[in-house]
């Protein structure tokens, strides 16, 4: 099991996702992964992807009615690559799709969507700056446009846009708008739709070798004087291409120079049929421009527009206005809308539902995550900060007041939501009024995040003790495993404010499935003891902090030797585990002001006026501090229970080297364990609670390292 856990701890979270459904508006900034399978955007929602250099799709794209997919760049040197390369994937748009690289002026963008089928019933925008030539392509063996497609560039370049597959047939029953763009038609085209060229756009029909390559119902509209249409001269094609809007200087041409040949003229116009014929020797093409043109206003010119074959004298221009005898078909009257701006709420947000097929559970040094069935964007247990005020009105008669609450939560992986478990009393303030002094204490916020791959019971126990001299607030948070693969995370927080001269005591226990190391850093007098309580499911419950009667376990005592009127005690204990996810944190911050506490111990003769903590099998008659319950004598049993399930190392490091840190005693009842005869050395390690040996900090790291290696290879 340890070997399996070690292997899992080195793996990254990996999930094979088959689909994602956008149900509410979502905006993503910067680099994201779009290779996530099928994508569906529901009606009323949009997905806006901003400044993501490469957006690669691997599954079906389905944009519902009144929905939108926006991919855009706002950075001049960030080109956009939007790719779909799947022979079986389909693109279905009933809403709005906008691929917008108009601001990308320093790089070549590319839009190339190659799938099994393409169907547009809504609005589809392909936009670029045109500063650098780029290619745009919407490819599918089955290709249908019933809506609006806009191919736009800020300025004309040699780039082009292509629809469909070479040699296959596309069906256009809608409107295709070109602005500063070249549409190169390489496939057959069917349908009664319209292709509109405006603002220096060109239509290049390069497949007229097939006499049926262009439907007689398909329409090409030259919307301004800078637009043009050109066909490839590969033979004299009897097919007639419908052209609207010819006039005002725009052009119709071939890929060869116009010249007389084979008994014919370079160009001719039939006013009855409205057909304009162009020829280059044996090659030629016919265009139905409509009636009403004046033959004197035709002239041979050169179309040297970018992106199309440019030949001298290869086109015809008409200098007069467009005659009104030929009305536009309904498809050409559809408005060529401007490219929409991408929605941007200024921040990243996410509203989606993800379906996954397979998932691999993995952990790092702090968490274990698993996703199954639906997206779990975050599964977090958060300890919220709340303030609880404990007031003792009869401090002279109160031995202690404790409030204990247990909150049980479970973290599951079947729901796609953020799980937040709040444990109150993470920030606790207590006030005790006495005739001599007032002490307040606040415990720091304790935040723990636990994500497990199996069901886990999380138990939070908060214990607050109030004595006549001050408040001791102890908060212990632990997690017990519901399965052998789950990891236990425990947090212990303790806060105590004694009267002046009192020593601050911190009690912390950590249990888990792997060794824990607890490092304690103290700046003033600190002693360690263990409060009583009955562990449940691995949780350790403390009824308070003792300072008079020691437990039979190992006691680390430090006494002040100076007369101090005001004492600020701060103790912080942090437990970490490099190979697991167990975390234990004990934080004690206290400030007390008042007269010296004289702990008169009847059976000892140590009369220290500042801090006389002689806690070795004696009856302590504390005149100021009397908050110790008889149940504290059970601590040794609790220690045995805890240490039987894990190896706990308590490392004590003192900031001030002038004070002794620990007393070592082979017998708990030894009366020589007083502050005056302390032989402890800063930086000692006390294994478990026996006090039988001392190890250096370096040895602690060695043992922790060997334990880690052992866990990895077992």
Swiss-Prot record:
InterPro entries to which the protein is assigned, alphabetical: Hyphal-reg_cell_wall_N
GO cellular component: extracellular region; fungal-type cell wall; side of membrane
Polar residues composition-biased segments: 320-330, 505-519, 545-558
Bias (Low complexity) ranges: 346-504, 520-544, 559-590, 597-625, 665-679
Keywords annotated in UniProt: Cell wall, Glycoprotein, GPI-anchor, Lipoprotein, Membrane, Secreted, Signal, Virulence
Induction conditions: Expression is down-regulated in absence of GOA1.
Keyword Cell inner membrane applies: no
UniProt subcellular location: Secreted, Cell wall; Membrane
Lipidation feature positions (GPI-anchor amidated asparagine): 690
Keyword Transferase: no
Known function: GPI-anchored cell wall protein involved in cell wall organization, hyphal growth, as well as in host-fungal interaction and virulence.
Record-given protein name: Cell wall protein IFF7
Organism, scientific name: Candida albicans (strain SC5314 / ATCC MYA-2876) (Yeast)
Gene that this sequence comes from: IFF8
